[in-house]
Amino acid sequence: MINAMTTSALDSGEIKLYIKDIMRPVLGIEDLYKAIKAIIDCKENKRGLYNLASFNKTAEQIAYEVSEVVGAPVVEYEADPTQIGNTKAQTKTYNFSISTTKFKRAFSFKFKETVESITKSIFDNYKDIIKTNRGKIFDYEWL
């Protein structure tokens, strides 16, 4: 979501916001790396299923925080539920939020990434990011 909003801002000059009330968990790449390292470095057997997320926020909160970093306006569009293929997303209140309490307690872990830190990373590295058309097949073998 942050990737798409930042890319939209840099490519079109605006952040498009359709279903603003959907709650989303977001995991920053630095937090992912540190969480995996915490698991690998742990000397105890703490096998289990864990949720990982740097934070949970609504699409609206994320959009306006991305806007602060990139300086592009948020343009709110009214989503047409008949044009949304994912039936779960047809409601304005679908909630994807997750709890990371179990992981934080088990590994004494603190998630640190924010919308701002993730957006700045994308913004600062934008020219080096390989952009693809999601509608076309892309051959990554040459990388």
Where are the language model's segments positioned?
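Mid/C-terminal beta-alpha module of Rossmann-like enzyme folds, strongest
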Residues: 5, 38-88, 100
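A general structural signal marking secondary-structure boundaries and capping sites
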Residues: 9-13, 42-43, 70-74, 107, ...
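Core catalytic loop region at the nicotinamide-binding pocket of NAD(P)H-dependent oxidoreductases
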Residues: 13-17, 39-52, 129-138
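Residues that recognize and position ribonucleotide moieties
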Residues: 25, 55, 96-97
